[in-house]
Curated annotation (Swiss-Prot):
It comes from Neisseria gonorrhoeae (strain NCCP11945). The lineage of its organism: Bacteria, Pseudomonadati, Pseudomonadota, Betaproteobacteria, Neisseriales. Zn(2+) binds at residues 266, 271, 273, 279. Residues 85-242 form the CP-type G domain. Keywords: Cytoplasm, GTP-binding, Hydrolase, Metal-binding, Nucleotide-binding, Ribosome biogenesis, RNA-binding, rRNA-binding, Zinc. The gene is rsgA. This is Small ribosomal subunit biogenesis GTPase RsgA.
Length: 307
């Protein structure tokens, strides 16, 4: 089984004994400045103690008042999930307590298979359901990209088509009942989809941007919205890379739906799935039961983590 999550001390079912009058949820953040919302719907500007930055959009936190408009975040409550990325130099928390990741992609501008596969891997590692959203599906360039995405449907990842000029209603049943996050490259239409889903709430986003001194750069930080009483949506900044250095190489096969059933079936328990005889992974790729490209991806990520 996969190793213990590096943030496992903060992932569990929230304690029902926590009092509600001193708790809030982070709905936006930039650096060490945050916007939090209490259970009664009141929003506050928030700072942290001792320059802490280990908070994420979606975190439920304990707060202490500073004045009528400001509070201090004391700590986060136990997390149900944590989505983050890590390269060789730094860790970037993306969102906490999400139950569903929607990877927004489109044929234009040029989509990244590398980013898609890495985001899917991160979702598997975090125990978060992943959905692929094919936006701008009415573009003529879409057909070839859709054909490539159909492979991921065979792995169990739904592919939902949306069109920028429509109202994103095809997404609403998928989002319902989940704490969702939209993630993808810049230019894929995440914010446009968010605005379509929010409708009349869109005009309120300027207040948060002003509070964070972010001006017009409304996609430089993650932001959480309530779509209804049971559904939340986080719009996140566009990204080009998704570091996976927080994962353990030995755990990787568990995060591949196309290979996890083969774990333990190789002749050697320490098989690297390369040149060893009796490798179940290699056999699956050679017979067409699994994709050779996916095996190469697994090998590449393994090398990256061990390098």
């Amino acid at each position: 089984m996969p190793s213990e999550h590096p943030f496992s001390d903060g992932i569990s079912t929230p304690n029902p004994k926590e009092t509600m009058n001193d708790t809030a949820q982070i709905t936006a953040g930039y650096g060490r400045r945050y916007i939090v919302r209490t259970p009664d719907g009141t929003t506050y500007e928030a700072s942290t103690r001792k320059k802490r930055v280990d908070f994420a959009c979606g975190d439920r936190v304990r707060i202490s008042p500073v004045n009528a408009e400001q509070v201090v975040i004391e700590d986060f409550l136990p997390r149900q999930s944590l989505l983050y990325r890590q390269d060789a130099w730094k860790t970037k928390l993306i969102a906490a307590n999400v139950t569903q990741l929607l990877i927004v992609t489109a044929a234009v501008p040029s989509p990244s298979v590398r980013l898609l596969q890495r985001a899917l891997l991160a979702a598997e590692a975090a125990g978060i359901r992943a959905v692929i959203v094919l936006n701008k599906a009415d573009l003529p360039e879409t057909a070839l990209w859709l054909e490539k995405l159909k492979f991921y449907e065979t792995l169990g990842y739904p592919v939902i088509e949306t069109r920028v000029l429509e109202n994103a209603d095809s997404l609403r049943p998928v989002l319902q009942g989940h704490s969702n996050i939209l993630l993808g490259q810049s230019g894929m239409g995440k914010s446009t989809l968010t605005n379509a889903l929010l409708g009349s709430q869109t005009a309120r986003t300027g207040d948060i941007s002003a509070a964070l001194d972010s001006g017009k750069h409304t996609t430089t930080h993650a932001r959480l919205y309530d779509l209804n009483g049971e559904t939340q949506l986080i719009d996140s900044p566009g990204l080009q890379e998704f570091g996976l250095h927080h994962l353990q190489a030995a755990d990787l096969p568990h995060y591949f739906p196309d290979f996890r059933h083969l774990v333990g079936q190789c002749r050697f328990h320490n098989c690297t799935h390369r040149a060893e005889p009796g490798c179940a992974f290699k056999a699956a790729a050679e017979t067409g039961a699994a994709s050779p490209e996916r095996l190469a991806f697994l090998q590449g990520i393994t090398d990256e983590l061990l390098g």
